[in-house]
């Protein structure tokens, strides 16, 4: 999964989970990520690192204009509905390397696909080994 973002100017993203209003995010955008995507763009905007075994999605605001807006973790079975508004911004939606402009007021849904894919991972390397090695997780840099 990817993100909704602006090219210039501020956008507002009305966000509903299972038809319940969560919040209207005002800022540069909103990232909806899976556990696999949690260590990418979502992490860089302050989202949590999520273990791949967790059945969840993460909603991470990008440069929110309200300091109380924080990432939220929701069940992976959730139906996320987003409605995007912008006064003076060009709005795009991006998933992986594909970017598509969307019109003001566009509404769309995000949910897990019914199909799954399997990632080949060596049995002798755990998720936590990878965190420590690639992200220097818990490494003491004081020396």
Please annotate each region the language model reported:
Residues 1-5:
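Short, small-residue-biased leader/transition segments that mark boundaries at the very start
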Residues 8, 28, 44, 120, ...:
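Generic signature of intrinsically disordered, low-complexity segments enriched in small/polar residues
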Residues 9-13, 28-30, 39, 53-58, ...:
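A generic structural signal for short beta-strands and their flanking turns/coil linkers
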Residues 12, 31-32, 41, 62-64, ...:
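Generic, low-specificity signal for short hydrophobic/alpha-helical stretches with a mild N-terminal bias
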Residues 14-33, 83:
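Short, hydrophobic/aliphatic alpha-helical segments
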Residues 17-21, 70-143:
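ATP/nucleoside-binding phosphotransfer catalytic cores, i.e., glycine-rich phosphate-binding loops
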Residues 24-27, 32-68:
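Gly/Ser/Thr-rich active-site loops/lids in small-molecule metabolic enzymes
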């Amino acid at each position: 999964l990817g993100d909704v973002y602006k090219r210039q100017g501020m956008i507002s993203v009305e966000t509903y989970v299972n038809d319940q209003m969560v919040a209207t995010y005002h800022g540069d955008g909103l990232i909806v990520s899976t556990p696999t995507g949690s260590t990418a763009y979502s992490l860089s905007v302050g989202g949590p690192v999520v273990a791949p075994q967790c059945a969840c999605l993460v909603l991470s605001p990008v440069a929110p204009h309200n300091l109380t807006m924080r990432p939220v973790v929701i069940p992976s079975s959730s139906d996320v509905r987003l409605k995007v508004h912008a006064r003076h911004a060009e709005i795009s939606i991006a998933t992986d390397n594909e970017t598509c402009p969307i019109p003001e007021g566009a509404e769309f849904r995000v949910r897990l696909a019914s199909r799954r894919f399997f990632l080949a991972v060596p049995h002798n390397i755990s998720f936590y080994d990878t965190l420590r090695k690639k992200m220097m997780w818990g490494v003491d840099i004081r020396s």
